[in-house]
Amino acid sequence: MSMKWTSALLLIQLSCYFSSGSCGKVLVWPTEFSHWMNIKTILDELVQRGHEVTVLASSASISFDPNSPSTLKFEVYPVSLTKTEFEDIIKQLVKRWAELPKDTFWSYFSQVQEIMWTFNDILRKFCKDIVSNKKLMKKLQESRFDVVLADAVFPFGELLAELLKIPFVYSLRFSPGYAIEKHSGGLLFPPSYVPVVMSELSDQMTFIERVKNMIYVLYFEFWFQIFDMKKWDQFYSEVLGRPTTLSETMAKADIWLIRNYWDFQFPHPLLPNVEFVGGLHCKPAKPLPKEMEEFVQSSGENGVVVFSLGSMVSNTSEERANVIASALAKIPQKVLWRFDGNKPDTLGLNTRLYKWIPQNDLLGHPKTRAFITHGGANGIYEAIYHGIPMVGVPLFADQPDNIAHMKAKGAAVSLDFHTMSSTDLLNALKTVINDPLYKENAMKLSRIHHDQPVKPLDRAVFWIEFVMRHKGAKHLRVAAHDLTWFQYHSLDVTGFLLACVATVIFIITKCLFCVWKFVRTGKKGKRD
């Protein structure tokens, strides 16, 4: 009997091992807003597969409440800011970025860098609060986590993994100029055919556009810095007790989960430890709330238009709101507008305002004809998933670039949010709704997205489990990470070969000169 029980317990353990990646323990360094939405989708799936997931959350976290019921565990660390103060700072920085004039390239990106550094100063204080919290660090050490999951644009996840001596996996949408992807991930982005992110170019560039792209590349390479590297390098060196850099620590990532895919991104080279998981949060539409469904059905054959500027922009100016409402009032479609502000005076009877909308469910509704979007990656992927053409009104960050990608693929029309007129918006809506080519292109992208051997979410979870099972994935990291910059570009080899060629040429020249001198001397002797 005891043998049978032993066998049964062994089978249960083996079942746990194979079905849920050894039932591992995952520590998460989270992000806010839409970044959290993507991470949480992965975390929920990990929990479903039997893993224990712990989120390291600050007491000022905005996007999640550690006290609400959840299948996730939260380890809360105290910070000097309150949730309200932190949220106000974020909103002010976002508002400032969204309203930046693009008069000159240099001025715009200098101010963007300043905004990013301001946020990173706050983040670095949070990080210092963690490492100085001996009780918390001891608890994390004793928890024996198997892997750290972090977003690469929010530093510290990699330092946490280094301190706990465990592997780590990155989730990343993009970094300005692909700086993180290139310097820490080792990815290649040839400027001749890959437009640098935030350039708003496509992969079909003219000569002048390639010149522009090269200028962007050089600027991001030698001037623009996402992080104040001196401060981060000093902080990491102090914590680890040895000279190091943020970039060097980030380069130790085992797997990079890039929230992109070829339905969205232009083709470029990849590496073995980089996996595209764009649209992992997308899912089939669920039924709408009764009142909303009745409004949608009342649209008849004309259908509906969905309008949202995302979660980070709560409202807009009264003047802009009236411009938009005036255009929406002139279309035959019904409109569901996510809007948190005073009701515009020009609002038409065909338009309803909502503080929140089930965006994915609306985009998946058969009566949806178009999506007016600020160009956030999550919203665009939901539109791709359901095959909905877009009118893009980008505001900041990667949004102009995202809309440029969709425009290049024939699935969107782009407008300038700050300067567009009612006529501009009206014409754009008529174009994407009435021109069948936009719907066809959107459906083509949708078919590409759905035609994958493994779903993006399953790929993401597989690689996290893979890292836990194998205690890392160092065998997938290219040796380029171990080379200096001059070795990587083969400058030492090139210099050596040039020296060899120069030496050979010198020796041959010297020999020829000696032969010539000898012959000349011989001829002169015969004459004498």
UniProtKB/Swiss-Prot annotation:
One of its GO terms (biological process) is xenobiotic metabolic process. Glycans are attached at N315. GO terms for molecular function: glucuronosyltransferase activity. SUPFAM superfamilies: UDP-Glycosyltransferase/glycogen phosphorylase. Its EC number is 2.4.1.17. Pfam families: UDPGT. The keyword Flavoprotein does not apply. It is a single-pass membrane protein. Gene3D superfamilies: Glycogen Phosphorylase B. Residues 1-23 form the signal peptide. It is found in: Endoplasmic reticulum membrane. It catalyses: glucuronate acceptor + UDP-alpha-D-glucuronate = acceptor beta-D-glucuronoside + UDP + H(+); 17alpha-estradiol + UDP-alpha-D-glucuronate = 17alpha-estradiol 17-O-(beta-D-glucuronate) + UDP + H(+); 16alpha,17alpha-estriol + UDP-alpha-D-glucuronate = 16alpha,17alpha-estriol 17-O-(beta-D-glucuronate) + UDP + H(+). The chain crosses the membrane at residues 493-509. Belongs to the UDP-glycosyltransferase family. UDP-glucuronosyltransferase (UGT) that catalyzes phase II biotransformation reactions in which lipophilic substrates are conjugated with glucuronic acid to increase the metabolite's water solubility, thereby facilitating excretion into either the urine or bile. Essential for the elimination and detoxification of drugs, xenobiotics and endogenous compounds. Catalyzes the glucuronidation of the endogenous estrogen hormones such as estradiol and estriol. This is UDP-glucuronosyltransferase 2B4.
